[in-house]
């Protein structure tokens, strides 16, 4: 299993229209493969939409992308290309301890925090080992929706996405996770060389809400 994470930066004020068009084209898109998640940014880099598609492997993705290019039903509908300022696509591999995206129901109206850590080459195995031990206790406070390492695109990235009811719960959980007696953050013996985060809101049609 791999996940393609596509991030589009849009012109200010166009996110609602882009999502509306995406929703209209989605039934045709779903004939080819399933959507994993669709979010837009609330904090962090603004005016971004992030859509995630799971595939069996790279060959599966290639077949789907080729079929999409030839799909007259989908291509007849406006997609919003005129709104796009920049596009980025990355292929992610799920961490061994990650549950499949969308395999749990978090309800609706949630906030998702996507944190991306970039490590020095060779450090990710240590990070994965430490996180595998620490995640079960951390999930007592809030669910881990996704955890990936980058395979294609920007390399040496570790991406983890957490679910919160709102920004206030996020603050409470982060304080609680660092309380005495809790082994968080995981101690891998290595530190990221770069960190960034985004707070995300799911689109109305996103399977992960």
Region spans (language model):
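Short S/T/G/P-rich N-terminal loop/turn motif that feeds into the first structured element of a domain
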Residues: 1-209
